Amino acid sequence: MPIAKVHARSVYVSRGNPTVEVDVVTETGLHRAIVPSGASTGQHEAVELRDGDKAKWGGKGVLKAVKNVNETIGPALIKENIDVKDQAKVDEFLNKLDGTANKGNLGANAILGVSLAIAKAAAAEKGVPLYVHISDLAGTKKPYVLPVPFQNVLNGGSHAGGRLAFQEFMIVPDTAESFSEGLRQGAEVYQKLKALAKKKYGQSAGNVGDEGGVAPDIQTAEEALDLITEAIEQAGYTGKISIAMDVASSEFYKTDAKKYDLDFKNPDSDPTKWLTYEQLADLYKSLAAKYPIVSIEDPFAEDDWEAWSYFYKTSDFQIVGDDLTVTNPLRIKKAIELKSCNALLLKVNQIGTLTESIQAAKDSYADNWGVMVSHRSGETEDVTIADIAVGLRSGQIKTGAPARSERLAKLNQILRIEEELGENAIYAGKNFRTSVNL
């Protein structure tokens, strides 16, 4: 079915920054995708093309990327007349048109918008939901697996104001019977946590961060974990809900000293208190011994390979590479060879096409890694990643707290998918790391 029209426009993400929205029109109607954007971006990611005009949006405009879709990509794609159902061919064409390894010419934000909108057009042409089409593209087996929602309920690091260095603390409802039950448990714990935060740290502690989590003025990881543990207990789920952390440690790595500064938000932090990677690894292990931690993301800086490999050898929980791997096939290959981590954080906008995202997941599965599909801190009402998580059988999705519409949009979409699939789906639960094999 030919493409009648490709049109991009500038819209906004949840942080008030511009992003690219793409419409693809075929005989089945209009198919739309919006590209997310991150705050802490890894240096090995595909290029998010920004205008750089400081007079508008502080330089963060995407009018160049929009123009690239409307004047270059769209006309070329229509002329090429590729079948929208052949996603690999479409994405290969987009990459060739760009001509760079990191999509720096046309912009990964321009290319991804088109790639995802095309996938939606293809699903419509086949008369199936998007997750079914993605499952077909990836060749995943049935039944469908619904992911465990990793819910970021407490924010620190670059996402929040207090001294807390670690960026995200997530609750993981991995003993629930179903996705909807897991989400309910998460929502109940979140409400308790909000009330606790206000009571202990004052009314403003109930204010939410970019991803919907609370951001009280917390100093240490222990303090954060104690608060979450108390909320889990108050909700009646002690022993039933696990915890995960995204440390985002590249944000507080001192490259020259090769040390980690847990007081990085303080301009006068004391260099004698900075930690070596061994000391930081010991801190993680002591936390995991005391709290039900099942997953740690970005425990070390993105190029501190030695630290990752050291930690991997001595840990049994899930170690997720985000800044380390940036959904990039070459980085994933290196991480597999160096035995650096055992799970991939999959962010479609880090690599820039659906085909490459699917391949990144398959490469990870092939080495028995887990795959966690992830939102970005700058999100929109687009729910594509919910379908990707189900279509890829990833078994785990990270899309913020059960708060703020741009986060809940994805979780609500999985509720709909769960209802639609009924008995034909299983909840990943405790098997979230190996759900592709369920």
Curated annotation (Swiss-Prot):
In the UniProt entry, which residues are flagged as the active site?
A: 211 (proton donor), 347 (proton acceptor)
Tell me where it mainly resides.
cytoplasm
Q: Which UniProt keywords apply?
A: Allergen, Cytoplasm, Glycolysis, Lyase, Magnesium, Metal-binding
Q: Which residues bind substrate?
A: 159, 168, 297, 322, 374-377, 398
Q: In the record's cofactor note, how is the cofactor described as bound?
A: Mg(2+) is required for catalysis and for stabilizing the dimer.
Give the record's pathway.
Carbohydrate degradation; glycolysis; pyruvate from D-glyceraldehyde 3-phosphate: step 4/5
What is its subcellular localisation?
Cytoplasm
Gene Ontology molecular function: any one = magnesium ion binding
Per UniProt, the enzyme's principal EC class comes to lyase
EC number, as in UniProt? 4.2.1.11
Any one GO BP annotation for this protein: glycolytic process
Q: Where does Mg(2+) bind?
A: 246, 297, 322
Listed under GO cellular component are: phosphopyruvate hydratase complex
Query: Which family does the record assign?
Result: Belongs to the enolase family.
Subunit organization:
Homodimer.
Q: What name does this protein carry?
A: Enolase
Organism, as annotated: Penicillium citrinum
Q: Which gene encodes it?
A: enoA
